[in-house]
Amino acid sequence: MGVKGLLFSIVLINLSLLGLCGYPRKPVDVPFWKNYEPSWASHHIKYLSGGSTVDLVLDRSSGAGFQSKKSYLFGHFSMKLKLVGGDSAGVVTAFYLSSNNAEHDEIDFEFLGNRTGQPYILQTNVFTGGKGDREQRIYLWFDPTKGYHSYSVLWNTFQIVIFVDDVPIRAFKNSKDLGVKFPFNQPMKIYSSLWDADDWATRGGLEKTDWSNAPFTASYTSFHVDGCEAATPQEVQVCNTKGMRWWDQKAFQDLDALQYRRLRWVRQKYTIYNYCTDRKRYPTLPPECTKDRDI
């Protein structure tokens, strides 16, 4: 190989490394079928524009759900949702990541419907090693039924960040040094579902689903997945190799100054419940609540 050939090979290697680390790919709009498949009640799922948009439908007989075809350990996952409009009390739309075992890990978006004119509540939760009870609830700063908005999760070995339209609404930091489990080794699939939860979803179950408004429809598009596929112990080991992917890089190990300002804005203006400030429930705060300046 001549000098020119050697230089060309070096350039190719460097370009391939850039694909692995340093530069996150922007969300790519891909059809539903590329990454997802129905998980239950497929007859209540509608496919529009060749699968670029998908509607989940809830009526008295059933809701519906879908899941990713593959499992992932770390990455960036997003989709755009338009929630059920009108009187949606009792109706829950969920977008979450979860492993499939007893001591499971899970990262939740749960959109809790409400009476007409009353705002949606977005509840997030993080389960590690089977332990959850880390609820946070916010109002959104827009009407999520009028158009599509992006909801995403960044998950690496340092933190889990939950975003709404690129605004961080929650950061769950790795607090393993404080004895708090963190999702390192259990690959998770991505799920979404629409179902009736009027026993708890709206005002603790006081507001019931008004079935005269059925069918209820939640609409999805932009099914973006950029994660490390992990179906075997060997693949889990590869995904845990730090520095291999863009989400391992320094820029993604913590929020930047602008993201912290945006998170504080959400906390001050829109947060209505945070388990880390619930002294009645937790007279002694959970360890992870004392660690980070964003809590």
Curated annotation (Swiss-Prot):
Compartments reported by the entry: Secreted, Cell wall; Secreted, Extracellular space, Apoplast
Gene Ontology biological-process entries = cell wall biogenesis; cell wall organization; xyloglucan metabolic process
Matching entries from CDD domains are given as: GH16_XET (cd02176)
**What does the entry list as the binding residues for xyloglucan?**
E110, Q123, T124, N125, D133, R134, E135, D199, W200, G204, R281
Superkingdom of this protein's organism: Eukaryota
Q: Which cysteines are joined by disulfide bonds?
A: C228-C239, C276-C289
InterPro entries given in the database record: Beta-glucanase/XTH, ConA-like_dom_sf, GH16, GH16_AS, XET_C, XTH
Q: How is it modified after translation?
A: Contains at least one intrachain disulfide bond essential for its enzymatic activity.
Role played: Catalyzes xyloglucan endohydrolysis (XEH) and/or endotransglycosylation (XET). Cleaves and religates xyloglucan polymers, an essential constituent of the primary cell wall, and thereby participates in cell wall construction of growing tissues.
What's the protein here called? Answer: Probable xyloglucan endotransglucosylase/hydrolase protein
**What organism does the UniProt record list as the source?**
Nicotiana tabacum
